[in-house]
A protein has these predicted regions:
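Conserved alpha-helix/loop element of class I SAM-dependent methyltransferases that forms part
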Residues: 57-86
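Conserved SAM-binding loop
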Residues: 77-83, 88-194, 223, 265-267
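N-terminal, positively charged/glycine-rich alpha-helical extensions of SAM-dependent methyltransferases
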Residues: 24-52, 56
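Short, small-residue-biased leader/transition segments that mark boundaries at the very start
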Residues: 1-7
Length: 270
């Protein structure tokens, strides 16, 4: 019986648990070519006009979805309190350069950002220091972190699930890291013809917003499939919203109905 997972946040990290003769052997493997390719982009994280421009454009929409639910679920007033998220422990898996970690820290949360690309962690740490933000960044996988048995009030799993080999295994790890009554956020890309046109042909080949090969359509996942994975891991879906690009305003907007390409799910552990 084998169980494996591929972590890829601008790089690939594989962890396989192989069972033979009632013993378990853990094998770790890093795809050097993938890591080198995306490590080359690491210094681009905070360049709003660079390779990560699409993510910078999407970030306000992601933050709106996250903070709306944090405010309601944990009864936090983001309009009055100076540090409304104080007391919350937040884990950002696949944190990259810290685009979500930094705003969460500014709101008062205790933030841990993890990534399997070491250069991403170095870039994120340097930028946080420059911004005078206290953020704990670690070069570690979610599996290795789980072995330390920490628990978090909130887990951010944004634009990462489409890069893992086994989404079911990955979501199960996330569930085990989440406190009871905690919240988990997962944004990814739907699997249909439109998502192929927009997320791959449009974004990577026509507009060249993303490097070619960033996404594999076969790893895209439908909202119904992702919701089932949450359910199977003991998580209850609270809300699903679409991230829709408005070409007239040249910005991203939240949608209650359009999940055809980019979407995000908020779930809780009961």
């Amino acid at each position: 019986r084998g169980l494996g997972d591929v972590y890829k946040r601008q790089g690939i990290y594989v962890v396989c648990h192989v069972y033979r003769n009632n013993s378990m052997k853990t094998v770790s493997s890093i795809n050097d070519e993938e890591v080198k390719k995306f490590e080359h982009l690491a210094n681009e994280w905070w360049n709003t006009e660079g390779k990560f421009k699409p993510l910078h454009m999407l970030n306000p929409c992601r933050l709106e979805f996250i903070t709306d639910h944090l405010s309601m679920h944990f009864k936090k007033d983001l309009t009055i309190d100076k540090k409304p998220l104080k007391g919350l422990k937040i884990l950002d898996i696949g944190c990259g350069g810290g685009l979500l970690c930094e705003p969460m820290a500014r709101l008062g949360a205790e933030v841990l950002g993890i990534d399997v690309v070491e250069k991403n962690i170095k870039v994120a740490s340097l930028h946080a220091k420059k911004m005078k933000l206290d953020i704990d960044y670690r070069h570690i996988s979610a599996e290795d972190l789980l072995r330390k048995k920490p628990k978090f009030d909130v887990i951010l799993n944004m634009e990462i699930v489409e890069h893992v080999e086994s989404p079911a295994f990955f979501i199960e790890i996330c569930s085990n890291l989440l406190k009871t009554r905690g919240l988990i956020f997962c944004s990814t890309i739907n699997k249909n013809f439109k998502s192929y046109l927009f997320a791959i042909l449009g974004a990577e080949y026509i507009m060249q917003w993303l490097p070619k090969g960033t996404h594999d359509w076969n790893k895209f996942i439908k909202p119904s499939e992702l919701s089932k994975l949450f359910f199977d891991s003991g998580l209850r879906v609270k809300d699903t919203k679409g991230f829709v690009f408005n070409p007239l305003a040249w910005s991203w907007e939240l949608s209650k109905r359009d999940f055809t390409v980019n979407y995000s799910i908020c779930a809780t552990k009961e």
